[in-house]
Amino acid sequence: MEKIKVALVSLGCDKNRIDSELMLYKLNEEAELVKDPKEAQVIIVNTCGFIETAKEESINTILQMASYKKTHNCKVLVVTGCLTQRYKGELKELIPEMDIMLGVNDYDKLLESIKVFLKSGEKSFYHKYSDTKINEGNRILTTPTYTAYVRIAEGCNNFCTYCAIPRIRGKYRSRKKENILKEVENLAKQGVKEIILIAQDTTMYGIDIHGKKVLHELLRDISKVEGVKWIRLLYCYPEEITEELIEEIKNNDKVCKYLDLPIQQISNSVLKRMGRKTTKETIINIIKKLRKEIEGITLRTSLIVGFPGETEGEFSELKEFVSDIKLDKLGVFKYSKEEGTSAALMEEQIDEEIKEKREEEIMILQQSISKDINKEKIGKIYEVIVEGIKEDMYYGRNYEMSPEIDGEIYFEKDENVKIGDIIKVKVTHSLEYDLIGVVYNELSK
């Protein structure tokens, strides 16, 4: 393939980002990668099909990119990702402007499909379902040079009643530890300091290979890789957290004292309707245990409001939980009715207006909690990874802050500081979600 210009538009979650980075690497040797789709002859859209708003964004993006065939240089439109895997034939009929459609297990056909279309105009449509394949290999990072996401498993076995992911991504399958470690070593050699481990459920890592959960062993081995400074864990189901994992987080200096716990709800009746394999008591007990065992741990969660049948009493129970437990970070999503899920067939679907009201109530409550928590940080000194400059101020993150979803720490410019450095910052002021501070002491790289 001649050096044709290719642009990739990646939508959705960080797991999708990794798929995009794998595709970019495959394309790089035979194509010129450009950031602006208006300049590209080949445009690839990696879609999200998880919830209604994500589907709408994906379809709108596909249609916008398709218009570039008339207004700009686009000759080939490739669409891939969760939306194509989920809707297959429907999408093909809905958007005939697509030239190539690939499912989430078909990225190995990307380059050849583009070549065939450019040569003969023959369209290609693949959507293979796989419960065994895991997309892995070399990547071109789209994150800052000091941070990278590493997928440790694919798929999900939970089959929550509201979620279509198992039907899109297949059953849970862990990557081999040696492959993960090799990837981390390569990333560290490129200058990556922060490794963020992701999966649909990171806490289940190894269960399918070893018959037991071995995330704690993986953390221990990754921490031995030269150049890795921080290891961050996302998507940890509270009911699957083991004593060994708690001990590893507690005692391993490279593991951020930070856990993302996708709780979703707290009322036992709602949890049961959701198909969650946990209870209110289990969730509260593990939160208390984590706070007792791991000094300074930051806990983040995501909640769903407006699940079918959610009563005022169940919602009040959720508000009471948020108010009493006071989690450090919290995001709220309105329930999205998804085709192919049992929750979509449930009676007592909640009006959109009520969902919005409940979402707002939780966020206002959490805003106040976050403001109080941040006030307590004034005077504390943190290691901060420097990320950039906004309005003559540097900004970065400490161990309590995950990229893009949490707040930031702002501090005055310092001529000795470079983006990607890890430095010490003393907090002097606090806001609802962000902190303000000054560079403290010498540079700590």
Swiss-Prot record:
Domain TRAM: 375-441
Record-linked SUPFAM superfamilies: Radical SAM enzymes
CC per GO annotation: cytosol
PROSITE patterns, sorted: MTTASE_N (PS51449), MTTASE_RADICAL (PS01278), RADICAL_SAM (PS51918), TRAM (PS50926)
Annotated binding of [4Fe-4S] cluster 2, by residue: 156, 160, 163
Record-annotated Radical SAM core domain positions: 142-372
Subcellular location: Cytoplasm
EC class of the enzyme, as a word: transferase
Keywords: 4Fe-4S, Cytoplasm, Iron, Iron-sulfur, Metal-binding, S-adenosyl-L-methionine, Transferase
Residues binding [4Fe-4S] cluster 1, per UniProt: 13, 48, 82
Pfam family, one: Radical_SAM
Keyword Oxidoreductase annotated: no
Entry EC no(s): 2.8.4.4
Cofactor(s) the record lists: [4Fe-4S] cluster
Cystine pairs: none
PANTHER family xrefs: RIBOSOMAL PROTEIN S12 METHYLTHIOTRANSFERASE RIMO, RIBOSOMAL PROTEIN US12 METHYLTHIOTRANSFERASE RIMO
Similarity remark: Belongs to the methylthiotransferase family. RimO subfamily.
Cited function: Catalyzes the methylthiolation of an aspartic acid residue of ribosomal protein uS12.
UniProt-recorded name of the protein: Ribosomal protein uS12 methylthiotransferase RimO
Organism: Clostridium botulinum (strain Loch Maree / Type A3)
This protein's encoding gene: rimO
